Amino acid sequence: ALLLDAAAQVGGDIISAGGTGTSDINTWASEIQAGTFLLGDTQYQRLDLPFRQAIFLECSILSKGDGYVVANAGLKALGMDHGDPRWPEGQVMFCSDEHTTLVPDAEQRIELDQRIRLVPAHLDPTVARHETMWLVDGTEVVDEFPVDLRHW
């Protein structure tokens, strides 16, 4: 109501408000400031919005133990303010500075040096920790984009 009152006082054709998380319920804004929908993160997947997650952190398996594996990506590579990343092939057990310990699902056969994809819980701070984003189609690299959010 406050924003609608301000728009009535100031005038103009555009009332810009909201974001990805309210894009499906905001009926009064004429422009939605939805940005995360493009790549998604686990927070928005929980809202059951009509967008599919399209960002992953690719990493490699460094070691194997009895019932667990360790990947070469941890707190320094992931935005952790919304919790642990998700791993579709199993469960995330623990994230340390540079590694993530994972428990594979029983049917998974994970090998050393195997590349896996972690699903970031929060997109923005994860992207800000990297210098390049890679656009892939399956396993093929299609393009790359520099990231200018580093060190923000």
Regions found by a protein language model. Name each.
Residues T36-P85:
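Internal helical hairpin/lid segments
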Residues Q9, Q33, Q43-Q45, Q53, ...:
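Residue-identity detector for glutamine
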Residues A1-L49:
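Active-site loop/helix belt of alpha/beta enzymes
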Residues L2-D5, Q53-F56, D97:
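Conserved active-site and cofactor/substrate-binding residues in soluble primary-metabolism enzymes
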Residues G21, T27-W28, R46, P50-F51, ...:
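Generic structural signal for short, flexible, solvent-exposed coil/loop and linker residues
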Residues K64-W152:
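C-terminal accessory subdomain/extension
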